[in-house]
Amino acid sequence: MKYLLLGFAVLTLSFCLPVDATPFFNSKLGYNLSYKAYSGYEKIDWYFPEQTTRMYYSLWQGVGDDIKDKSVPIIIWLQGGPGAASQFGCFNEVGPLYIHPDGKLQENGYSWSNRGHLVCVDQPVGVGFSYNRGKPVTDTYEASLHFTNFLHNFLSEWNFLENPLYISGESYAGHYIPSFARFLMAN
């Protein structure tokens, strides 16, 4: 278990800004990726500008897809919980790599990145690598405000505003997603 956690932390922290992660995998873990991986933070500042709030994401470029192709869907993955980091689902369920308990990587032939650009978002703020220096998120309404702000900033920054968008998840994400969709439609 400790190797799983260590491997997860190394993989996630190794690309904390939008960077091609291939050199890291080649040099550090001996694994050769056939696609690009990115990660970073989006500032959340629409509704709470006085707080230092950041939402963490990892972006897995669709296998064989051009990052600039507007026809490639954006697939958002939200873990359940509440309080479970989406990076867990990324490395154990829907992402392109599995991390085994011994720390070894295995390619996931059924990854959702085979169908589009996969984005795993740690939410609500305070979960995983997302953080808030103000008051904690305590309800779905506030989580919806943060997610709407995140998604607007993320899609704008990556120039994905015209791409098809799918928001998916498991467990408690089924509670969040309808609320997020309502906020997105209103904003």
Spans of model-derived segments:
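Non-catalytic N-terminal regions of enzymes
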Residues: 17-20, 24-32, 119, 149-154, ...
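Glycine-rich nucleophile elbow surrounding the catalytic serine of serine-hydrolase chemistry
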Residues: 83-85, 169-182
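Secondary-structure transition/capping motifs at alpha-helix termini
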Residues: 157-158, 187
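Alpha/beta-hydrolase fold nucleophile elbow
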Residues: 159-172
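N-terminal cap/lid subdomain of alpha/beta-hydrolase-fold enzymes
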Residues: 53-54, 58-145, 152, 183-186
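Catalytic-loop region of hydrolases
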Residues: 2-74
